[in-house]
């Protein structure tokens, strides 16, 4: 999921790749006003919204929200800009993300910006990689539970 956010892609939590049947889980609001079309996904306590440009399909903003009476509310907002061509794809050379949570009993916010001067790749480089087996999967609820103990 984090890799998909960085690469400015739609994703389904827990899935490595999207296929035609998985795309049916997304809702698209083609009647939206403005320059973007919201693509949304609801999964349990989490909501995902990707705002795609109506002209070229690039995602300008992704918002991931987690709501829980027990763990509070958390929101990740990821903004994309300064798109540049990398091979045949458009890549956001500037990315800003803000994470806000009440899981710590008081509202806390962290913000980071990646502003890349140049984006290049080498030939034969695999865009989609897999996480090494030495790492174990940690569920969102477990991360929030750890934050709660801070």
Residues of each region from the PLM?
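Acidic/charged, solvent-exposed loop-and-adjacent secondary-structure segments enriched in E/D, K/R, S/T
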Residues: 1-15
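Gly/Pro-enriched, hydrophobic low-complexity segments
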Residues: 19-20, 24-133
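Gram-negative outer-membrane assembly/targeting C-terminal domains
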Residues: 124-150
């Amino acid at each position: 999921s984090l890799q998909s956010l960085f690469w400015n892609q739609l994703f389904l939590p827990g899935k490595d790749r999207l296929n035609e049947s998985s795309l049916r889980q997304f809702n698209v609001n083609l009647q939206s006003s403005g320059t973007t079309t919201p693509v949304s996904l609801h999964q349990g306590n989490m909501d995902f919204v990707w705002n795609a440009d109506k002209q070229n399909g690039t995602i300008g903003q992704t918002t991931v929200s987690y709501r829980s009476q027990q763990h509070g509310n958390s929101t990740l907002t990821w903004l994309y800009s300064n798109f540049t061509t990398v091979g045949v794809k458009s890549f956001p050379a500037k990315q800003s993300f803000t994470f806000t949570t009440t899981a710590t009993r008081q509202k806390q916010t962290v913000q980071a910006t990646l502003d890349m001067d140049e984006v290049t790749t080498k030939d034969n480089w695999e865009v989609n990689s897999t996480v090494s087996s030495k790492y174990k999967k940690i569920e969102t609820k477990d991360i929030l539970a750890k934050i709660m103990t801070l």
